[in-house]
């Protein structure tokens, strides 16, 4: 999956620079990924000059269905005269009642746009997309990408599954890239031994489905393009923004005190996933 600098940070930049957002709702499901992402985004927004009173943070349990009071709070928060946007790390089936309640309370994508990190083609498949049309999602791949390699992949996938209604999505592309990288690394190493493949995979480059190249970095993150899509009535995405090139994944965020001095480099002699550049020590799971 994407590192925060390959999804969450560019999404905020888009909302800030292209949409003009000045007030921010960070809404997430109550578990580690949304909480960590929102800590990063809160710090990032404050570094951009956003004040505490212009940031609202909300967490709900998995499967949350009663969004009336929270959406009412979002609506009130967005009525202060500043352009407001929602950055959503809400996961799973809680998304459906969330977007429905936005519509019930008359909140359109033009009023308060929502950008999501867990709503893709598969999640939109098979249900009424009307409440979601115009809202946004940030991914590293969309089925609607205009690239010959993507068209060939989709044709092959639909032929294989024998169902023209099926969709492709970002996690599928990640598997596509990952398997091709593994094959290249095995070929390079001359063995399937996991340690040898781990060493060989750094620097491996394979085509992605957007017409570019994915490269495995020394920190075991790959380079990815960043795409922002607007939800359409057919459950597909109209790509409204994309990065000028591929973005290298940052294993440790520069916007958290506990990680800004940490780097990852799995090449010898360092071979460390959490190396503190100030202390010169490798810690955590690599501590010896």
Put a short name on every predicted segment.
Residues 205-288:
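Solvent-exposed, acidic/polar segments of extracytosolic/periplasmic ligand-binding ectodomains
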Residues 187-207:
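Polar, surface-exposed loop/tail segments
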Residues 26-29, 164-173, 193-197, 213-216:
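Surface-exposed patches in mature extracellular/periplasmic domains of secreted proteins
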Residues 20-27, 79-84, 136-139, 159-166, ...:
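Flexible glycine/proline-enriched surface loops and loop-helix/loop-strand junctions
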Residues 40, 177-181:
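Short amphipathic alpha-helical face segments that pack within enzyme cores
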Residues 1-105, 144-152:
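Extracellular/periplasmic Venus flytrap/periplasmic-binding protein
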Residues 101-176, 186-192, 243-274, 283-284:
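Extracellular/periplasmic periplasmic-binding protein-like sensory domains
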Residues 10, 109, 223-226:
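Extracytoplasmic
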């Amino acid at each position: 999956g994407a590192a925060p600098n390959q999804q969450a940070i560019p999404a905020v930049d888009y909302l800030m620079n292209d949409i003009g957002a000045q007030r921010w709702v960070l809404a997430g499901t109550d578990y580690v990924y949304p909480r960590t992402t929102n800590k990063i985004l809160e710090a990032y927004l404050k570094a951009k000059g956003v004040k505490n009173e212009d940031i609202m943070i909300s967490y709900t349990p998995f499967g949350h269905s009663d969004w009336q009071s929270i959406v009412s709070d979002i609506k009130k928060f967005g009525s202060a005269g500043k352009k407001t946007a929602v950055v959503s790390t809400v996961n799973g089936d809680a998304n459906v009642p969330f977007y429905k309640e936005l519509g019930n309370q008359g909140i359109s994508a033009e009023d308060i746009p929502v950008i999501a990190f867990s709503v893709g083609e598969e999640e939109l498949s098979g249900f009424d997309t009307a409440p979601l049309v115009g809202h946004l999602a940030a991914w590293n791949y969309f089925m609607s990408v205009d690239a010959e390699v993507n068209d060939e992949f989709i044709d092959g996938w639909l032929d294989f599954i024998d169902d023209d209604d099926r969709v492709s999505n970002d996690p599928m592309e990640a598997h596509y890239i990952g398997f091709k990288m593994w094959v290249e690394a095995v070929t390079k190493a001359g063995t399937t031994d996991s340690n040898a493949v781990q060493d060989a995979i750094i620097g491996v480059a394979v085509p992605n489905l957007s017409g570019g190249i994915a490269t495995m970095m020394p920190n075991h993150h790959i380079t990815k393009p960043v795409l922002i899509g607007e939800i359409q009535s057919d459950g597909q995405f109209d790509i409204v923004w994309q990065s000028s090139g591929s973005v290298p994944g940052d294993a440790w965020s520069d916007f958290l005190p506990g990680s800004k001095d940490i780097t990852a480099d799995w090449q010898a002699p360092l071979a460390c996933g959490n190396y503190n550049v100030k202390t010169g020590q490798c810690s955590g799971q690599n501590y010896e």
